Amino acid sequence: MPEKMSEEKRALLRAYGAQVVITPMVEPEHPLSHYNVSKKIVSEIPGAFLANQFFNPDNVTQHYQTTGPEIWKQTRGKIDMLVGGAGTGGTLSGCAKYLKEQNPAVKIVCADPVGSILYDLYYHKKIVDPPGSYKVEGIGEDMLPGNVHLDIYDGFVRVNDQEAFDMTRRLVAEEGLLVGPSSATALIGAMKFSEKIEKPLNIVVVFADSGRQYLSKAFNDKWMVENDLLKEEQIKNSFNRVISAEEAIKFYSKK
């Protein structure tokens, strides 16, 4: 997995007994990219299997057969727009295919991190801005996965890291929703895209990650400050403030 992925994700894989191989953040065609390292490992280990989630059509099929119908059923068919991020593309493309079969008027919008090339490929049919680094995990790409079906999407919205991490913290503080930055990116995408529309819409937003996978990042004041996503003076009710029983008694006895 790429080195940008959180320690929580690495620890979870190790808990299941996996040997975790960390790859540098390099171009997709580089021999040390996670794409090529995984292919190399599979070629050398008898019986190894490469899920190839970026290009394996089964990825899209699963969401076409399960997630899409679930959304349609739970909304009773009253859905105007679906918004989500695209990493492998399986979730958004699979849901899009199913929902548009039920109602071609359903709009599919992809929220894309600033630094990803997908926005450019959709609107310009070419890469205008070279791939850049971003802290949001799981969505956005530096190449076009086979499972990102651009022809079935209806629009893209760009969201930067600051917006994503700010919203990640807001969602747990204001709504009690412990989700990750890719989910926050999707929500901001929905908010931005809906600003252009005058009539009320039923919008479904895909929250694809749990905040538990980002306790060391999005909910870590030190990491946020080090990555220029939080200023020291902004830290008031810190997520990382742990006090002793004696301190607590002393503090609350003053009130």
Language model regions located:
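A short, acidic, amphipathic alpha-helical segment used as a generic capping/interface helix at domain edges
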Residues: 164, 187-196
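Short glycine/serine/threonine-rich phosphate/pyrophosphate-binding segments
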Residues: 5-10, 85-96, 118-119, 182-190
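Glycine-rich beta-alpha junction loops
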Residues: 55-58, 87-90, 112-117, 141-143, ...
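Active-site-proximal loop->helix
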Residues: 1-41, 118-127, 144-145, 215-223
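Active-site/ligand-binding loops adjacent to catalytic centers
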Residues: 34-36, 47, 101-181, 218-255
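Active-site/ligand-binding-proximal alpha/beta "capping" segment
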Residues: 45-86, 94-97, 150, 154, ...
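Surface-exposed amphipathic alpha-helices with a cationic face
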Residues: 96-103, 194
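Residues that mark the start of a beta-strand
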Residues: 105, 201-202
